[in-house]
């Protein structure tokens, strides 16, 4: 070690102290002995004050050193005795006259005076070196006052700011200090309290950051005092540095309060973004405004300048945490989500110009992808000099004035090889049909998509756009209106599909835990069926079929060549007024990507695909219909029987192969239509005739009927008992749905004690909410993929053989090989409903029961009784015995009522009906039910107003007056 290193002072406050006074075995800190710690940038900074440490046991107390340290700390002028300095002292308040002669003149010339001054300065400098005190007499500091507030835009040099930093507290030595005197930080945080990203210390990150700066508390308060307009304020250099500093701290230190692990939220999101090989970082506006409310308001009111700074900071942070990611993406885009203010398209005005807005609507048209200039270079045609690069954005237009080499004013041509382009696409966003006021036309707005937002939405999808509402010059509008008019567009920053609100990454951990808890309920299948359209009374077979269709089976792709559909198609056929359309409307609100259409309002191209000429590019473009828009969802077709035969034939391919082939206008392609079809139709003549076959009751051909997995026939049968229950259910439903302020007691007088049906009309706790049902279906379709075993296939084959034999005698719907696939699909759907990864015997039995119900309901009335008797063991599976006995009891009541009307005449008023218990026992034995006592004590028996008279052996049921 040379002398210069030995003589280096360890602390600025200990004059004359050097390391040669220490014993040979004493270890000094890096700040005292390492010459690298004294760089040119830090020569004015007090770098060793908090790092050098001296063992108090090695050196004795030195009064001179202690006095020097106290002298450096300074004297407290405002102590208790500071007024003593101003007391009157006559003996000292006089000037000495000795040695003072006003007549003496300095005869030195200017050179001698300057020489003496330089000698005095040299002596003072030498004294400062001996005492170890910094001279700190630099001319630039004399030219301005550090406390002035006249020009807050002046940025002090970093070395100058270091001289005025507040003194740091002395660091207490710790046993876990490393060898160079640095204190190990907590995991995931740097010494400044920020995440260091593994091998990259924050000191290395900030040295190369052009936006890195330090602001004291007063500087930060001044940054929030906007001077002038906000758009001009955020373009100032010191404000941009301040925004960058705060946003960097937010990215590296924000912890989500909902995160129990306490990890840094956006460091985790950055890592997930890198794993997904994406270049967009989503920033939650609500989280950002909670930490930095002023900057968040600046972001909403002046988004162009603020986003530019935020994207630059995000790029530096990502590339610091992941060094090699700059080789994959050259830029990181900041996407703002959860903007709290939502505006309608028709409410956008001039006040929203150049601000960030959030709007929603339906995409009606999407242009192609075009290249847009981003970084352009020009060639001078006269001298060949390459000019540039010039950065082009949506707000400025690059124009070259003259060539710096030959001073010519052109012409200039674009250098194609060195010019960089970016992707550009335009969407037309139209108001959603449900929010357009009556009698008004829907309004639309152009949306610009750039970079990785290309093709994020397609025509027909409902989306929400967060972006900058800006304007551009449109020559056609000026020509049309005759005065300057600017076209307004929305430059998209973030696009979210409304169908994705219940997608996988939107489900929280609490939602997943609740869904898995529901799946453990052995009655979850019954609860889901009850939750399908709970406002519709009865129709358990239709609700079961719709539930299976919403969950769907497992799609199979045989070696990538032949695909077997996993979606389940359902046809509802019945009399008018049996809630067929209401079932479709409920599925539209509950199902994922449900598209609703009608047979009369939809043509062949409206259901499949259409080819039309784009009005802007004059090119033929392909636009998908309802089946294409419902890909991976459900297509709902009402009034299916009203469609033309040509239109109905066009969906044959879509229902079985789940694709649509197009060969029009030079476009030969195939579109995906992987969706379930749930259709509703009315029979011929308006009423279903049970004496005729299914094909005779509906105007549908066998090819289209065989493509439906489940056929549900709904008949409006006159049944006094059922009609009374239905009427009570409807009236009670209307009573509960009265608007606020209505007096329900005046409208529907009910008394729980007098009315035994009051309890049954209360809300069923087994019914799931619509939102929970949405989440449950989404979770099941994305995470559960059930498989079927070979043992289950034998039972399916046996049932198929029996059905083929029975269908040959009847005149109903013929049984084909497609029905085997239907049983397999429904088995998989039932297993998915219970979140099982395999198909059990229970799932196969349920699928067989649903198919048999569908098959028998399409037969003639006379054939149905025989089929029900033959397939009784399958049809009674998992049916509640109490419900079955209640159905048998209702049948007996109806038979007795019909007999009494024949004997006594239709004008006879009956107050009650009596049914023998022995008759009910005989009916129950046909279904292998021998004990009726549980039924007599059940809620089904009691709530349906039945009374048991054991002494007489009869069951009494009162009739409505």
Swiss-Prot record:
Widely expressed, with higher expression in developing tissues. Residues 1-81, 120-220 are annotated as: Disordered. One of its GO terms (cellular component) is chromatin. Its EC number is 3.6.4.12. Residues 1-17 have a biased composition (Polar residues). GO terms for biological process: cell cycle DNA replication; DNA replication; double-strand break repair via break-induced replication; embryo development ending in seed dormancy; mitotic DNA replication initiation; regulation of cell population proliferation; regulation of root meristem growth. A motif (Arginine finger) lies at residues 706-709. Signal peptide: none annotated. Residues 39-78, 205-220 have a biased composition (Acidic residues). A zinc finger (C4-type) spans 380-406. InterPro entries: MCM, MCM2, MCM_CS, MCM_dom, MCM_lid, MCM_N, MCM_OB, NA-bd_OB-fold. ATP binds at residues 574-581. It is an enzyme of class 3 (hydrolase). Residues 524-730 form the MCM domain. Keywords: ATP-binding, Cell cycle, DNA replication, DNA-binding, Helicase, Hydrolase, Metal-binding, Nucleotide-binding, Nucleus, Zinc, Zinc-finger. It is found in: Nucleus. It catalyses: ATP + H2O = ADP + phosphate + H(+). Residues 120-146, 166-176 have a biased composition (Basic and acidic residues). Pfam families: MCM (PF00493), MCM2_N (PF12619), MCM_lid (PF17855), MCM_N (PF14551), MCM_OB (PF17207), WH_MCM2 (PF23669). One of its GO terms (molecular function) is helicase activity. PANTHER family: DNA REPLICATION LICENSING FACTOR MCM FAMILY MEMBER, DNA REPLICATION LICENSING FACTOR MCM2. Belongs to the MCM family. Component of the minichromosome maintenance (MCM) complex, a heterotetramer composed of MCM2, MCM3, MCM4, MCM5, MCM6 and MCM7. Interacts with CSN5. Probable component of the MCM2-7 complex (MCM complex) that may function as a DNA helicase and which is essential to undergo a single round of replication initiation and elongation per cell cycle in eukaryotic cells. Can complement the fission yeast mcm2 mutant. This is DNA replication licensing factor MCM2. It comes from Oryza sativa subsp. japonica. The lineage of its organism: Eukaryota, Viridiplantae, Streptophyta, Embryophyta, Tracheophyta.
